[in-house]
Every structure is written in C-alpha cells, then in structure tokens.
Amino acid sequence: MFGDYSISDLGAILAMQGFAGLILFSVYVLMALGLAIIFGQMGVINMAHGEFMILGAYVTWMTSNAVQHVAPWLFPGYFFIAMILAFTASGALGMLVEWALIRHLYKRPLDTLLATWGLSLILQQAYRSVFGAREVGVELPEWMMGSWQATDSIQIPINGMFVMALTILITIAVAYVLFWSSWGKQVRAVVQNRVMAGAVGINTEKVDRYTFGLGCGIAGIAGSAFTMIGSTGPTAGQLYIVDTFLVVVFGGAASLFGTIASAFSISQTQSTLEFFLSGSMAKVITLLTIVAILMVRPQGLFALKVRK
C-alpha cells in the first residue's frame, strides 16, 4: 500500500488528507456539539438532529439568493447574516419540538427515539415538498474562493480554513455558555440532580427547552457551514447523523472535551484511510475500532461523573 510512494509523496499525501480530515472534523464538531448538549445533558436521542442541520443549510441557501437579488452589495458578508438566521430558525424549531413533543417523552428513551425518527421523516418530506428533491448549493463570495499554496504540493482551500475558524469560535462560545454563564450553571445543576435543582428554584422545564433549542441552533450553524463545502438536499442530514452519534458516544456523553477529541480522532482516521482504501472500507475499519474501544470503555473516553 505504501511501497508505491516516496517519503516526500507520503508526507504530502498525509498533509492533504490531514487537512481534509480537519474539514470533516469541523463538520463533526459542529454537529456533535449540538447533539452532545441534547443527548449528554438531557438524555434525549434526537434522530432528527440531521434535519435541523439541513434547515440551517436551506436558510443559508435562501439568504444567499435573497441577498444577490435584493442587496447585492451585502453579498461578500451574507454568510454571517445567514448563520444568525440559521441558528435562529433551527433553535426556534427545536424549542417548538421540545414543547410539543419531547417534554412528554422524558425518561422514555425508546419512545423518544421513535418519535424523533418519525419527525426526521416528516421534515425530510417537508424539505422535499418546499425545496424540491434536487440538491442545491450556494454561491461563495469571491474572498472565500481559491486556495492557499502552503507548499509546492500542498494547497489548502480557503473555504475549508473559514469553516475551521468558525468551528473554533463556536466551540469557544459553547464552552463559555456551558461552563461560565449563569444559565450554563443551571444546565449543569439539572444534569447533576434534577430534583434538587428544582428544589432550589431552577425552572427545569425552561432549562430543558432552551437547552434543546441551543443544541438544534448549533446544528443549524453546522448546516450553514456545510453549504460552504458541499451541496444540500432533503436527506443530506442522514449522511452525518450516525457518525455524529459515534462522535458523542465515543467521546463520552456530556463531555465537551471528549466530543472534540473524538471528532478529531475519527475524522483523521477516516480521512487518511480513505486515500489508501475505499471510503466504505475506511468507515468499516473506523467503526470496528470504535466498537472495540467501547467494549473496553463503554462510558466513552472522557465521560463525566453524574450524581444519581
């Protein structure tokens, strides 16, 4: 497998695949952050998480088209407007879903899984009816096109660098909200002991609703970022939902650091193996490795201790 390449060729290949893995890592982190908040903090298995991501992608696509026709002078910075709208739309829909559906199914994981899976099918059909079955893509601003020539053999796309920078900023913001804000302290109090948190005056229902909305809103941002590197279709979210659950479970539920470490290891392993093997074989080997590790450490790499 490696005999056909010189050392310099292998170095360039590993560097390029490593950067491709970083782009995949960025998508995984943005998706997994929202899912880790919902699954790790609330214990809800949200099978419709990918559809909240696609809602953010469609909002970005609509914003791109609207800005080009109504206010073309805003086009170079339309993505920042679209990202805010994507977060708002996905977060608002998430809060509505929590109020109408999820709050009735707490402590019933199988019912929650079935209900959110049905919701994912409903949302897919809704997207197909409104936007059509064909995939759509956004037009990138001129400053986001092209690539940076790192070396003679290594080119790094600018849009990929932008997605990685966005991921870093969102991760820092989420860490601040969860660990240093007063609302984040309430969330962690509810996770540690829901009954005691309610006894000291924390509105646990409100915390649940805003937590679910935040997780879905971050998925919307992930969808917005996804449009920078790929096209969007009604079922595109299903391509990432399994990998995202793997990231969360492998890293350890409710562990922000575990989510990041897990996303990095999975994306880098998968991206590197894809060059030397087929994409399907890379996924199989990655999955088998994760299963083997989880058999030894079923709580994940960095699981948090939770008081019962």
PLM-predicted stretches and their roles:
Residues 153-232, 256-261:
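Helix-loop-helix "hairpin" substructures at the membrane interface of multi-pass membrane proteins
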Residues 1-31, 59, 71-82, 108-113, ...:
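Membrane-interfacial amphipathic/re-entrant helices at transmembrane-helix boundaries
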Residues 70-119, 126, 173, 261-266, ...:
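Alpha-helical transmembrane segments within multi-pass membrane transporters and channels
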Residues 15-63, 96, 100-111, 128, ...:
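Single transmembrane alpha-helix segments in multi-pass membrane proteins
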Residues 104-105, 112-180, 207-210, 272, ...:
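Transmembrane helix-bundle core of multi-pass membrane transporters
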Residues 51-58, 103-128, 237-249, 265, ...:
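Pore- or pathway-lining transmembrane helices of multi-pass membrane proteins that form conduits
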Residues 13-20, 174-182, 208-254, 270-283:
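Inter-helical junctions in multi-pass inner-membrane proteins, predominant
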Residues 37-58, 107-112, 183-186, 209-210, ...:
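Short, non-helical or kinked segments that cap or interrupt transmembrane helices
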